[in-house]
Structures are given as C-alpha cells and as structure tokens.
C-alpha cells in the first residue's frame, strides 16, 4: 500500500478523540488494512479484533492471509473463532453476534479497540446496527489505490500464497488437505482464490492434491497468480463499492 495513503488514514484517526469505543478500519482485500490496524493499535496500546470469517479457519492460514500478518511484539490480534474446514461455513449472523460480544467486552472494561476487516457480511451488519451498538464507533474506509497498481499488487499477493510461508505450507497444500475431506466442497469453492485454483484443476484434469505435489513451472505459477489476482481485484472492487455506498467517501464516519 502507498505510504501516503497509510499516513492519511493515520491522520484521520488522529483528528478523532481517543476514548473507550471501537475504531474500525474497513476496506477492500489486500490493501494494507492489517498493517494500518497494527500501526494504530500499537500507537494506542489497543487490541485488534479481526472482522473476518475466513481468517477464523486454522487450516486456511495462508489462503486467508492470516499467516502473513506481521507478528508484532506487544500486539494483541483477536479472531472471532478457531475453526476448521470440517465445521463448514461460519454463519454470518453467528459471526456478527460474536464480533459484537468481543468488541463490547473490551469497551465495557473501559478500553478502546481497533476493528479491522473487509467481510461484506459483517461490515454491512455493523453498519446497519451502528446507531444501536452498545458502544461508540468510528469507521475509516480505506480506498483502493489505482486499479493497475492494485491488480499487480494482488498478483504478487497470490504468488506469495502459492509459494507459502516459512513452514512450507501454501495455498495449494491447504486446498489439497481440505478437498480430501469431501464434505465441504461447496464451501471451499466459495473462497476467493481457491475457486480459481479449482477451475484450473478442472480445466487441466488434475486433482488439487496432484497440483499441490507438483513443482510449479513459471508458466503455471504465472497463470494461477494472474487468475487469483484478477479474482481478488473483482472482489475488492465489490467491497469498495459496497463500503462507500454504506459509509460515504473514504474517511472517518463517527457514531
């Protein structure tokens, strides 16, 4: 994400009086919400609550981007649940109830808490009930940078997921392990990024397990990364359209 955009986001919150309540950073996938939330939380010694359902799955750490969140000393990042693919889709209403309970628990103790997220289902529910929430809330919508830069950024993000983290785990191994469970194929295929890989597997008549065990050629890596990057951009543009329609122009909305 461009440094100037991050500085603008920080400045917007600097103009808001910091007191017990929720300070939300919302926006499209892959634009640096986690980094900005970390920066804000550290500057105020506040916890971060992640308003995201897919990041709750311990067997999708790379796929969801959770594995790449910086482990910053002194930072407390809280997820809404600790689930596995076998449990299936995390019901949006259940997830939202959990989100409000977690946020309320911090505010009731007199704490300020940073909320970060791009989950359309959770952020829309948050917006629809914002006037009735049991705590004050401030929302900052982070904008997508220029579209061409965003696509290149998401392709690079996809490459990172395909290559994996320091443990050797990557998006392909997570997909292969989840796919053999057999009972959650529809849910798995609904996850952005995984849907692109499954389409590639179907086109080339290979299973996710076979693909995960291959040494990817540059050509295949480029093809998968471009497909996934395009999917992330498509999803990100939809997120931004919905969030701007809901909260208004990029910037801070207070309640």
UniProtKB/Swiss-Prot annotation:
The keyword Metal-binding does not apply. It is an enzyme of class 2 (transferase). InterPro entries: P-loop_NTPase, Tzs. Its EC number is 2.5.1.27. Induction: During the interaction with host plants. Transmembrane segments: none annotated. It catalyses: dimethylallyl diphosphate + AMP = N(6)-(dimethylallyl)adenosine 5'-phosphate + diphosphate. GO terms for biological process: cytokinin biosynthetic process. It comes from the Bacteria. GO terms for molecular function: AMP dimethylallyltransferase activity. Keywords: Cytokinin biosynthesis, Plasmid, Transferase. Belongs to the isopentenyl transferase family. Transfers dimethylallyl groups to AMP as part of the biosynthesis of cytokinin phytohormones. This is Adenylate dimethylallyltransferase.
